[in-house]
Amino acid sequence: MLPLTHNEYFTTSGHGASWKVHLKPCTQVPKSFYEECIRAAQILYESASSPLILLFSGGLDSEYMVNIFKDAGIDFKVAIISYGDYNTHDTIYAYNYCEANGIVPIIIDIDIEHFIISGKIIEIANAAKCCAYQIPSIMYGISKIDGTVIMANGEPYVKNFDGDWRWEETERVNSYMNWFTSQGIDGTPDFLRYTPEITLSFLKDPRVVQLVNNKLSGKLSTRTSKHMIYSRDFELAQRPKFTGWEQIEKTSLMNNEAFSVINDLKKQYNGVFELSWTKICQHISIES
């Protein structure tokens, strides 16, 4: 089994108010974000014991990841999780990319109505200690993939708290790690943070440095700036940030008791961990 992050540099402990992230420093001086992503792809390829399956949602993060593996010259397959007509507004970007690049994706079909009504969504949320209702269906899809599963679960996120820029991690998003571990899924949910060098290279990217020095008026986080960072290396179309649940949320399915049950999990599993940008950079910089 692959470690969820390289050399287990990123681990967590506790739950809720006691939830914490523990980090190990870089083992070499980071190069650019792009170069470190290429290196991480090579590490995963060399370490994997089964074919690499890249989970492609249609979002910027997963498209950047797929491009990285292409540039690295690594063999891989692509998997797309489908909720039928409910998430085509999101997956259309993945389908279009695959068509343009001659990729035949693996389609993981999920009957989202049955997934909710049957209570499967609650079962998985409890097993993964996940308090975000949009996530268990993705976890369910991952469990159906045969191979080494690679996800791109967001960039190293930095947020502006009244002028104080902080690196932030949430327990609900990191519940993917619980699912991979509990189900014995090989791979990583966090390709864009797989090594400490990726994390530090992103945090010290010139665009992020401008952000944290308040040189970009009106910007509140790295969410919008990452398109600019990713687009230095690849041509990526602008798109909204989707969860894939936007159409489902307009239906009566949301009246199902499952959602109140999952919401109650926030009392236990909704931890947040923050470090100032300065501290996180110091903490994971290579030891002298």
Would you name each region that the model predicts?
Residues 61-62:
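Catalytic nucleophile loop
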Residues 1-52, 68, 74, 78-84, ...:
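Nucleotide-activated chemistry modules centered on ATP-dependent adenylation/adenylyltransferase
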Residues 53-57:
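Class I SAM-dependent methyltransferase core
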